[in-house]
Amino acid sequence: MNDMGLVIVGAGGRMGQTLIRTVHAMEGVRVVGAIERSGSPHLGRDAGELAGIGIINVEICDEPLSVFAKADGVLDFTTPKATVEFAGYAAQARIVHVIGTTGLSGEDEAAIAAAARHATIVKSGNMSLGVNLLSVLVKQAARALDAADFDIEILEMHHRHKVDAPSGTALLLGEAAAEGRAIELADKSVRVRDGHTGPREAGTIGFATLRGGSVVGEHSVILAGIGERIVLSHLAEDRTIFARGAVKAALWARGRKPGLHSMLDVLGFTENSDQAR
Protein backbone atom coordinates (compact mmCIF):
# COMPACT_ATOMS: atom_id res chain seq x y z
CA MET A 1 0.00 0.00 0.00
CA ASN A 2 1.22 3.50 -0.81
CA ASP A 3 2.19 5.89 1.97
CA MET A 4 -0.82 7.62 3.51
CA GLY A 5 -0.94 11.26 2.42
CA LEU A 6 -1.74 13.51 5.39
CA VAL A 7 -2.70 17.18 5.63
CA ILE A 8 -1.62 19.18 8.68
CA VAL A 9 -4.06 21.94 9.64
CA GLY A 10 -2.92 24.75 11.90
CA ALA A 11 0.50 24.09 10.38
CA GLY A 12 2.12 27.21 11.82
CA GLY A 13 1.36 26.45 15.47
CA ARG A 14 3.49 24.53 17.97
CA MET A 15 1.51 21.34 17.50
CA GLY A 16 1.22 21.82 13.75
CA GLN A 17 4.98 22.04 13.38
CA THR A 18 5.41 19.00 15.63
CA LEU A 19 3.01 17.07 13.38
CA ILE A 20 4.94 18.07 10.26
CA ARG A 21 8.22 16.87 11.77
CA THR A 22 6.68 13.65 13.08
CA VAL A 23 4.89 12.68 9.86
CA HIS A 24 8.03 13.42 7.84
CA ALA A 25 10.07 11.12 10.09
CA MET A 26 7.63 8.18 10.28
CA GLU A 27 7.26 5.32 7.81
CA GLY A 28 4.00 4.75 5.97
CA VAL A 29 2.92 8.40 5.95
CA ARG A 30 3.90 11.63 4.24
CA VAL A 31 2.91 15.29 4.39
CA VAL A 32 0.89 16.22 1.29
CA GLY A 33 -0.71 19.43 2.51
CA ALA A 34 -0.45 22.16 5.14
CA ILE A 35 -3.23 24.60 6.01
CA GLU A 36 -3.20 27.91 7.84
CA ARG A 37 -5.88 30.55 8.40
CA SER A 38 -6.40 33.32 5.86
CA GLY A 39 -4.04 36.18 6.58
CA SER A 40 -1.47 34.01 8.34
CA PRO A 41 2.12 35.19 7.85
CA HIS A 42 3.06 31.57 7.12
CA LEU A 43 1.02 31.34 3.89
CA GLY A 44 3.22 30.55 0.90
CA ARG A 45 6.05 29.14 2.99
CA ASP A 46 7.27 25.57 2.67
CA ALA A 47 5.87 23.47 5.53
CA GLY A 48 9.12 21.61 6.09
CA GLU A 49 11.16 24.78 6.19
CA LEU A 50 8.78 26.27 8.77
CA ALA A 51 9.04 23.13 10.91
CA GLY A 52 12.83 23.15 10.75
CA ILE A 53 13.36 20.03 8.62
CA GLY A 54 14.19 21.66 5.29
CA ILE A 55 12.25 21.94 2.04
CA ILE A 56 9.62 19.19 1.53
CA ASN A 57 7.84 20.90 -1.39
CA VAL A 58 4.55 21.36 0.46
CA GLU A 59 3.35 24.96 0.39
CA ILE A 60 1.21 26.25 3.25
CA CYS A 61 -2.11 27.54 1.93
CA ASP A 62 -5.60 28.54 3.09
CA GLU A 63 -7.73 26.39 0.75
CA PRO A 64 -8.53 23.24 2.75
CA LEU A 65 -11.11 21.61 0.48
CA SER A 66 -8.88 21.49 -2.60
CA VAL A 67 -6.01 20.10 -0.51
CA PHE A 68 -8.21 17.56 1.32
CA ALA A 69 -9.50 16.27 -2.03
CA LYS A 70 -5.99 15.08 -2.90
CA ALA A 71 -5.20 13.53 0.51
CA ASP A 72 -6.00 10.41 2.51
CA GLY A 73 -6.40 12.10 5.88
CA VAL A 74 -6.06 15.22 8.00
CA LEU A 75 -4.48 15.73 11.42
CA ASP A 76 -6.27 18.43 13.39
CA PHE A 77 -5.18 20.03 16.69
CA THR A 78 -6.69 23.48 16.11
CA THR A 79 -9.68 25.30 17.64
CA PRO A 80 -13.30 24.15 18.03
CA LYS A 81 -14.57 26.53 15.34
CA ALA A 82 -11.87 25.49 12.88
CA THR A 83 -12.28 21.79 13.65
CA VAL A 84 -16.01 21.87 12.88
CA GLU A 85 -15.22 23.54 9.56
CA PHE A 86 -12.50 20.99 8.76
CA ALA A 87 -14.87 18.14 9.66
CA GLY A 88 -17.25 19.37 6.97
CA TYR A 89 -14.47 19.49 4.39
CA ALA A 90 -13.22 16.03 5.39
CA ALA A 91 -16.75 14.69 4.96
CA GLN A 92 -16.97 16.19 1.48
CA ALA A 93 -13.61 14.68 0.56
CA ARG A 94 -14.51 11.32 2.21
CA ILE A 95 -11.17 11.11 4.03
CA VAL A 96 -9.89 10.27 7.51
CA HIS A 97 -10.09 13.09 10.07
CA VAL A 98 -8.07 12.74 13.28
CA ILE A 99 -9.20 15.29 15.88
CA GLY A 100 -7.12 16.20 18.91
CA THR A 101 -8.82 19.57 19.43
CA THR A 102 -10.16 20.21 22.94
CA GLY A 103 -12.76 22.60 24.37
CA LEU A 104 -15.51 21.38 22.02
CA SER A 105 -19.09 22.34 22.90
CA GLY A 106 -22.13 20.08 22.64
CA GLU A 107 -23.01 21.80 19.38
CA ASP A 108 -19.49 21.19 18.06
CA GLU A 109 -19.71 17.51 19.03
CA ALA A 110 -23.03 17.19 17.17
CA ALA A 111 -21.55 18.73 14.03
CA ILE A 112 -18.60 16.33 14.17
CA ALA A 113 -20.93 13.35 14.65
CA ALA A 114 -22.87 14.46 11.58
CA ALA A 115 -19.67 14.72 9.54
CA ALA A 116 -18.80 11.15 10.60
CA ARG A 117 -21.58 9.89 8.33
CA HIS A 118 -19.22 10.56 5.44
CA ALA A 119 -15.74 10.78 6.99
CA THR A 120 -13.85 8.31 9.16
CA ILE A 121 -13.18 10.32 12.30
CA VAL A 122 -10.98 9.46 15.27
CA LYS A 123 -11.47 11.97 18.09
CA SER A 124 -9.85 12.05 21.51
CA GLY A 125 -9.07 14.57 24.22
CA ASN A 126 -5.58 13.08 24.23
CA MET A 127 -3.83 11.16 21.45
CA SER A 128 -1.05 9.72 23.59
CA LEU A 129 -1.08 5.97 24.00
CA GLY A 130 -0.18 6.27 27.69
CA VAL A 131 -3.11 8.52 28.60
CA ASN A 132 -5.59 6.26 26.85
CA LEU A 133 -4.24 3.25 28.72
CA LEU A 134 -4.50 5.33 31.90
CA SER A 135 -8.18 5.96 31.17
CA VAL A 136 -8.80 2.21 31.09
CA LEU A 137 -7.07 1.79 34.45
CA VAL A 138 -9.07 4.69 35.92
CA LYS A 139 -12.34 3.11 34.79
CA GLN A 140 -11.37 -0.21 36.36
CA ALA A 141 -10.31 1.42 39.63
CA ALA A 142 -13.47 3.52 39.84
CA ARG A 143 -15.58 0.41 39.29
CA ALA A 144 -13.69 -1.60 41.91
CA LEU A 145 -13.64 1.04 44.66
CA ASP A 146 -16.99 2.02 46.17
CA ALA A 147 -17.96 5.70 45.98
CA ALA A 148 -18.84 5.68 49.67
CA ASP A 149 -15.25 4.76 50.52
CA PHE A 150 -13.13 6.46 47.84
CA ASP A 151 -13.42 10.03 46.54
CA ILE A 152 -12.15 10.83 43.04
CA GLU A 153 -10.21 14.02 42.30
CA ILE A 154 -8.50 14.86 39.01
CA LEU A 155 -5.53 17.25 38.99
CA GLU A 156 -4.04 18.64 35.79
CA MET A 157 -1.35 21.15 34.84
CA HIS A 158 -0.47 22.67 31.48
CA HIS A 159 1.59 25.50 30.03
CA ARG A 160 0.54 29.11 30.44
CA HIS A 161 -0.79 29.37 26.86
CA LYS A 162 -3.52 26.72 27.15
CA VAL A 163 -6.93 28.37 26.79
CA ASP A 164 -9.44 25.72 27.94
CA ALA A 165 -9.99 24.22 31.38
CA PRO A 166 -10.31 21.55 32.55
CA SER A 167 -8.15 20.04 29.83
CA GLY A 168 -9.61 17.62 27.33
CA THR A 169 -7.50 14.92 28.93
CA ALA A 170 -8.84 15.67 32.41
CA LEU A 171 -12.38 15.39 31.05
CA LEU A 172 -11.49 12.15 29.25
CA LEU A 173 -10.25 10.72 32.56
CA GLY A 174 -13.33 12.06 34.33
CA GLU A 175 -15.57 10.31 31.82
CA ALA A 176 -13.65 7.08 32.39
CA ALA A 177 -14.16 7.38 36.15
CA ALA A 178 -17.85 8.16 35.68
CA GLU A 179 -18.30 5.16 33.39
CA GLY A 180 -16.62 2.97 35.98
CA ARG A 181 -19.17 4.11 38.55
CA ALA A 182 -22.12 4.02 36.13
CA ILE A 183 -22.91 7.72 36.56
CA GLU A 184 -23.10 10.76 34.29
CA LEU A 185 -20.09 13.04 34.64
CA ALA A 186 -22.24 16.10 33.95
CA ASP A 187 -24.33 15.31 37.03
CA LYS A 188 -21.42 14.64 39.40
CA SER A 189 -18.64 16.94 38.17
CA VAL A 190 -17.30 19.63 40.52
CA ARG A 191 -15.20 22.19 38.63
CA VAL A 192 -14.84 25.10 41.07
CA ARG A 193 -14.36 25.30 44.83
CA ASP A 194 -14.11 28.71 46.45
CA GLY A 195 -15.12 30.09 49.81
CA HIS A 196 -17.29 28.11 52.23
CA THR A 197 -18.23 25.07 50.16
CA GLY A 198 -19.37 22.74 52.92
CA PRO A 199 -18.31 19.10 53.14
CA ARG A 200 -17.53 17.13 50.02
CA GLU A 201 -20.57 15.48 48.45
CA ALA A 202 -20.12 11.71 48.21
CA GLY A 203 -19.87 10.31 44.70
CA THR A 204 -18.76 13.53 43.02
CA ILE A 205 -15.72 13.80 40.76
CA GLY A 206 -13.62 16.90 41.41
CA PHE A 207 -11.34 18.76 39.02
CA ALA A 208 -8.40 21.04 39.85
CA THR A 209 -6.59 23.03 37.17
CA LEU A 210 -3.07 24.51 37.22
CA ARG A 211 -1.49 26.68 34.52
CA GLY A 212 2.09 27.90 34.23
CA GLY A 213 5.42 27.79 32.48
CA SER A 214 6.01 25.36 29.64
CA VAL A 215 4.43 22.20 31.10
CA VAL A 216 3.35 19.94 28.21
CA GLY A 217 0.79 18.09 30.30
CA GLU A 218 0.53 16.41 33.69
CA HIS A 219 -2.54 14.52 34.93
CA SER A 220 -3.24 12.64 38.14
CA VAL A 221 -6.39 10.81 39.16
CA ILE A 222 -6.54 10.52 42.94
CA LEU A 223 -8.78 7.95 44.60
CA ALA A 224 -8.76 9.04 48.23
CA GLY A 225 -9.99 6.67 50.92
CA ILE A 226 -9.74 6.64 54.69
CA GLY A 227 -6.10 5.96 55.53
CA GLU A 228 -4.99 5.34 51.95
CA ARG A 229 -4.80 6.97 48.53
CA ILE A 230 -4.31 5.58 45.05
CA VAL A 231 -2.75 7.98 42.54
CA LEU A 232 -2.74 7.16 38.83
CA SER A 233 -0.63 9.62 36.84
CA HIS A 234 0.70 10.47 33.40
CA LEU A 235 3.40 13.03 32.60
CA ALA A 236 3.83 14.21 29.02
CA GLU A 237 7.39 15.38 28.37
CA ASP A 238 7.21 16.07 24.64
CA ARG A 239 4.39 16.98 22.22
CA THR A 240 5.72 14.31 19.88
CA ILE A 241 3.77 11.67 21.83
CA PHE A 242 0.51 13.29 20.72
CA ALA A 243 1.71 13.51 17.13
CA ARG A 244 2.76 9.85 17.02
CA GLY A 245 -0.59 8.84 18.48
CA ALA A 246 -2.42 10.90 15.86
CA VAL A 247 -0.47 9.22 13.05
CA LYS A 248 -1.22 5.80 14.55
CA ALA A 249 -4.91 6.75 14.62
CA ALA A 250 -4.84 7.87 10.98
CA LEU A 251 -3.21 4.63 9.83
CA TRP A 252 -5.75 2.61 11.83
CA ALA A 253 -8.66 4.53 10.29
CA ARG A 254 -7.42 4.27 6.71
CA GLY A 255 -9.77 2.12 4.66
CA ARG A 256 -12.42 1.86 7.38
CA LYS A 257 -16.04 2.81 6.86
CA PRO A 258 -17.21 6.30 7.87
CA GLY A 259 -17.93 6.64 11.57
CA LEU A 260 -16.83 8.25 14.82
CA HIS A 261 -14.11 6.49 16.80
CA SER A 262 -11.84 7.11 19.78
CA MET A 263 -8.25 6.22 20.63
CA LEU A 264 -9.62 3.33 22.68
CA ASP A 265 -10.80 1.83 19.39
CA VAL A 266 -7.34 2.37 17.89
CA LEU A 267 -5.67 0.64 20.84
CA GLY A 268 -8.02 -2.36 20.73
CA PHE A 269 -9.96 -1.72 23.95
CA THR A 270 -13.44 -1.67 22.35
CA GLU A 271 -15.57 -3.74 20.01
CA ASN A 272 -15.13 -1.06 17.31
CA SER A 273 -11.46 -2.00 17.14
CA ASP A 274 -12.38 -4.96 14.95
CA GLN A 275 -14.87 -3.10 12.77
CA ALA A 276 -14.88 -4.45 9.23
CA ARG A 277 -12.99 -2.38 6.72
From Swiss-Prot:
It comes from the Bacteria. Its EC number is 1.17.1.8. It catalyses: (S)-2,3,4,5-tetrahydrodipicolinate + NAD(+) + H2O = (2S,4S)-4-hydroxy-2,3,4,5-tetrahydrodipicolinate + NADH + H(+); (S)-2,3,4,5-tetrahydrodipicolinate + NADP(+) + H2O = (2S,4S)-4-hydroxy-2,3,4,5-tetrahydrodipicolinate + NADPH + H(+). GO terms for cellular component: cytosol. The keyword Ribonucleoprotein does not apply. NAD(+) binds at residues 10-15, 36, 100-102, 124-127. The active site is at 158 (proton donor/acceptor), 162 (proton donor). (S)-2,3,4,5-tetrahydrodipicolinate binds at residues 159, 168-169. One of its GO terms (biological process) is lysine biosynthetic process via diaminopimelate. Pathway: Amino-acid biosynthesis; L-lysine biosynthesis via DAP pathway; (S)-tetrahydrodipicolinate from L-aspartate: step 4/4. NADP(+) binds at residue 37. Keywords: Amino-acid biosynthesis, Cytoplasm, Diaminopimelate biosynthesis, Lysine biosynthesis, NAD, NADP, Oxidoreductase. InterPro entries: DapB_C, DapB_N, DapB_N_CS, DHDPR_bac, NAD(P)-bd_dom_sf. It is found in: Cytoplasm. The keyword Ubl conjugation does not apply. Disulfide bonds: none annotated. GO terms for molecular function: 4-hydroxy-tetrahydrodipicolinate reductase; NAD binding; NADP binding; oxidoreductase activity, acting on CH or CH2 groups, NAD or NADP as acceptor. NCBIfam families: dapB. Catalyzes the conversion of 4-hydroxy-tetrahydrodipicolinate (HTPA) to tetrahydrodipicolinate. Belongs to the DapB family. PANTHER family: 4-HYDROXY-TETRAHYDRODIPICOLINATE REDUCTASE 1, CHLOROPLASTIC-RELATED (PTHR20836:SF0), DIHYDRODIPICOLINATE REDUCTASE (PTHR20836). This is 4-hydroxy-tetrahydrodipicolinate reductase. It comes from Chelativorans sp. (strain BNC1).
